[in-house]
Amino acid sequence: KGFDVMYDKLTLQPYFIHGPDPSVKPKTAKTLEYAFNDYQTTKLMIISHPDDELIFGGVELIKHGPEYKVICLTNNSNNIRKSEFKSVMEKLNIGSWEMLNYEDTLHPTQKFNLQDIITYKNWDKIVTHNPIGEYGHPQHKLAFDAVKKETNNFYVFSKSNEKLEQDYLDYKVELLRLYKSEQPVINQIKTKNGSWFKSNSDTNYIEYESIT
């Protein structure tokens, strides 16, 4: 994929002498894997669950999909959700994507470790959940905390005062239908009628998505 790999004579760690960013020197097997898979991606989106990328950042990915690496922190062992996520990534022509296998829970006991993926190269843009977890989800808050631990230079999901342009909204809704297993939750987010939904806003993230 356009790289020549050399090895540091003292540490035996691999690094690249040719490529878009020759200053990148992966220090672990994982960052070496990232460097090979992600040399064309310049933007990073980190989400807690499959469908978060569409609900909160769908239009961003519709516009800039090939530039993004998308990291989903949970559900790698859930074959249904993994398959749905893969379908969405392919439809959006995402440059690179990965699912990790942290537990999907409303009562998390394990923090996310994102040091490798955030720090191995200089991302043009990093996007993740906001500090209140959008509607209060604990794992969304943890994702924000994990990103903030590694960098202060990032964007978060937010809501615009204006509804999305209709063409983008129509395509976003079409893509959301690929998450068949999550339709009840997606509908609750749109109508804000779930007992777990912590929001006094008249708007919802699906129709009023923004990144700030």
Predicted regions mapped to residue ranges:
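Active-site beta-strand->loop->alpha-helix modules in alpha/beta enzyme cores, enriched
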Residues: K1-N152
